[in-house]
Amino acid sequence: MNQLEMKKLAAQAALEYVTADTIVGVGSGSTVNCFIEALGTIKNKIQGVVAASKASEELLRKQGIEVFNANDVSSLDIYVDGADEINPQKMMIKGGGAALTREKIVAALAKKFICIVDSSKQVDVLGSTFPLPVEVIPMARSQVGRKLVALGGAPEYREGVVTDNGNVILDVHNFSILNPVEMEKELNNVAGVVTNGIFALRGADVVIVGTPEGAKIID
């Protein structure tokens, strides 16, 4: 079974958490694209979605699913999103698709965060296989970069990428994130940082892992 098939298994299993006549929060990325495709098969069951990226919005509309603005929704029953890495405590690194800030906003609206991944995304320590994305106000890029170096990281400017919010991304290598909650707070306190890709203060409630043996649910 290849990686795409495992992503589809996880995405399909997440449909079990979608209840009738609700608005669903949807993240972004390749695994979420599989979920959007699956959600299209039950689109008449739900009111619509709040999407965390313009790319996801576009795919949802192609499926004929109504997209709501986050400002018009007071809460969501569930938020479904992928991860670049996830640890046993259900904390994540996200932001490979540069949508981390909007993902945090929509996740904060949700009563339950369901993370869908294939088994390659599971790690013991965050930062093991994937650099940490940090969204930065453009004028602060160099200043933030120096601060990240002082903290032991090796930031790399993600050239040619502008976020949906008009900002830039620094991908920070060499971080072994042993205390994700404290690291998330510390980085978010750096002047010029919009947010960073550690999702520890608001981690996942349920993890659905696509494996060669089927979808494994961790709750």
UniProtKB/Swiss-Prot annotation:
GO terms for molecular function: ribose-5-phosphate isomerase activity. Substrate binds at S28, G29, S30, T31, D81, G82, A83, D84, K94, G95, G96, G97, K121. One of its GO terms (cellular component) is cytosol. Pathway: Carbohydrate degradation; pentose phosphate pathway; D-ribose 5-phosphate from D-ribulose 5-phosphate (non-oxidative stage): step 1/1. Keywords: Isomerase. Pfam families: Rib_5-P_isom_A. InterPro entries: NagB/RpiA_transferase-like, Ribose5P_isomerase_typA_subgr, Ribose5P_isomerase_type_A. It is an enzyme of class 5 (isomerase). It catalyses: aldehydo-D-ribose 5-phosphate = D-ribulose 5-phosphate. The active site is at E103. Its EC number is 5.3.1.6. One of its GO terms (biological process) is pentose-phosphate shunt, non-oxidative branch. Belongs to the ribose 5-phosphate isomerase family. Catalyzes the reversible conversion of ribose-5-phosphate to ribulose 5-phosphate. NCBIfam families: PRK00702.1 (NF001924), rpiA (TIGR00021). Homodimer. This is Ribose-5-phosphate isomerase A.
